[in-house]
């Protein structure tokens, strides 16, 4: 059963055409911690250090995690860039994400934000290696396909193949396409954060795929976006080769 927060995010994004999303704009965010800190606190200092560290550590491999500080003042964080994103664009996205979370979730100890090019998450609680099933939202194209009965199984087939491909890839990332007819293709993406095990990556992706009917039946494009993995399909290419 979906939480009210989950549903509200989905309805908020109902009118969004995915093709028009600006890569520089955040897709969504959650300020998920009820705990706060002050600008001069140890946690605030540790968080600033963590964000600086991630902005230099992540771009070379497209993913990174780190912790700064000790005990209750420890700041834990990770960032993930989409598998096709350049080092320069990854750096820009991670830096922008840290600044934007500071504006949108001021002095909250735990928060997460997504862009087309990256995600960033931090918390005073160690969340590494655990599937994040709480911070999640849907996006879909408002346009419908002509024949959803035949289209929906093809979406599931493509993304299921990409799930199998992604969890076997050290980068936990896969893209691909499926020919629909002589003039059109279906394009897909599956990606996990690399703190997960391979089996947990597949579990996360398969769960995301199973949730597509909640938002995206018969839609020309759709996404299930979470804190540990995301899947996406479109009728146009949306990643760099």
From Swiss-Prot:
Residues 25-127, 133-238 form the Gnk2-homologous domain. Induction: Accumulates in response to Phytophthora cinnamomi infection; this induction is rapid in resistant cultivars, but delayed in susceptible ones. GO terms for cellular component: extracellular region. It is found in: Secreted. Disulfide bonds join 81-90, 93-118, 192-201, 204-229. GO terms for biological process: defense response to bacterium; defense response to oomycetes; response to oomycetes. Belongs to the cysteine-rich repeat secretory protein family. This is Antimicrobial ginkbilobin-2-like protein. It comes from Castanea crenata.
